[in-house]
């Protein structure tokens, strides 16, 4: 692992700034890179427990660059960190994060839709684009305390294979409003509504979750959540 990290660190110098290269320019940034490498080494044991019946099919899968992809009534472009599949052709969409909050748990707040929808969007796109049976849309933190959040079909994925997850806030039942398929469809409907509002010039503050206002400097906002 140390050799791989050294190789990747050296390769950053040849990348352009538009490639989001990781090149420290100060002593503080150099220490941050060292901390990141230490976290990744510690993360290996956690990764070995994650989804043992699945294998990576795609890494850094680009969406909307070679083909036109529509989601919520508009063209979508992005990059999916990882798509895993099992022997039955079922797939899990994975996005890596440095840390995770309750906003990444779709059922963290009763009666409120998911605050973070990135992997839910990509899961719907993967179903359409690749024809895969997507059963999970996960966020995986590689930070000092690795954990998993997101949504998954509770009939397919087993809790021991999703370490450090609050399952009651993430598992989808087989049927009903909280089923995984229904969650993907409802998320797209919400996204379409938001797109229409933006195109109409409606930009009223509407916090999506408890942490949405954490870094907002507008303290006098009536919609602010503390």
Walk through the language-model features, giving the residues of each:
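Structural signature of nuclease core domains in nucleic-acid processing machines
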Residues: 1-226
């Amino acid at each position: 692992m140390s050799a791989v990290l050294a190789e990747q660190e050296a390769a950053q110098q040849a990348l352009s700034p538009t490639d989001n290269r990781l090149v420290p320019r100060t002593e503080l940034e150099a220490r941050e890179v060292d901390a990141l490498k230490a976290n990744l080494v510690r993360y290996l044991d956690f990764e070995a427990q994650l989804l043992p019946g699945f294998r990576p099919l795609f890494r850094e899968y680009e969406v909307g660059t070679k083909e036109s992809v529509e989601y919520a009534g508009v063209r979508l472009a992005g990059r999916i960190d990882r798509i895993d599949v099992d022997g039955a052709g079922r797939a899990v969409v994975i996005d890596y994060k440095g840390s995770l909050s309750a906003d990444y748990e779709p059922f963290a707040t009763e009666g409120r839709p998911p605050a973070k929808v990135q992997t839910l969007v990509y899961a719907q796109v993967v179903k359409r684009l690749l024809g895969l049976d997507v059963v999970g849309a996960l966020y995986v933190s590689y930070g000092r305390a690795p954990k998993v959040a997101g949504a998954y079909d509770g009939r397919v994925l087993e809790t021991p294979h999703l370490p450090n997850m609050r399952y009651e806030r993430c598992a989808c039942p087989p049927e009903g409003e909280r089923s995984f398929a229904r969650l993907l469809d409802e998320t797209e409907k919400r996204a379409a509504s938001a797109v229409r509002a933006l195109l109409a010039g409606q930009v009223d503050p509407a916090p999506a979750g408890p942490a949405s206002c954490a870094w907002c400097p507008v303290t006098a906002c009536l919609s602010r959540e503390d």
